[in-house]
Amino acid sequence: MRGGHKEEFMPDVEKRNEEIVRAFFETLSAGELEKLRLLLHEDATWGIMVTGIQGAGDKHGRKEIIDDFLKPIREGLFIPANPKVVIQHLVVQGQYAAVEAKGLGKFKNGKDYNNRYAFFLEIKDDKIFHLREYMDSYYVSTL
């Protein structure tokens, strides 16, 4: 079962939105930021819903999300194609999706990264429109 429906009875919009969410996290995990840019709605927002860590707060639009937020983290701190976002649970209802995931990877300094996440997404026009990210911010503050 996915999203409260047996898969064979999942409405087409929910199947499509599940595919969009899975493609988004696969592309993010691969570090393919230019491809990721195309999966984001032009008016996308990405909210880091924690306090007290670098990067917390809202990011608006593709440029800020990719160039000012994701690129410095992924290319500055981690080895290529890290960290991976591994979906553990995905629930889709209409244009909304909830994801429980693990972030696994390796920093350039050789240290391992292993964090837990919850993401809440809204899809609009077959693109990621709004994303809210929750994580273990205490873990991040100790790195």
Task: Name each model-derived stretch.
Residues A23-E26, G55, P80, H130:
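Short, flexible active-site loop motifs that bind/organize anionic cofactors or intermediates
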Residues V21, L28, L40, F69-I73, ...:
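Hydrophobic alpha-helical core bundles mediating ligand binding, dimerization, or RNAP-core interactions
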Residues H41-H89:
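A solvent-exposed, acidic/Ser-Thr-rich amphipathic alpha-helical stretch
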Residues M1-L39, T142-L143:
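Short, low-complexity N-terminal intrinsically disordered segments enriched in polar/charged residues
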Residues V21-F24, K35-R37, A44, I65, ...:
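Hydrophobic pocket/interface hotspot
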Residues R2-V13, R74-L143:
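A beta-strand edge to alpha-helix "cap/lid" segment located at domain peripheries
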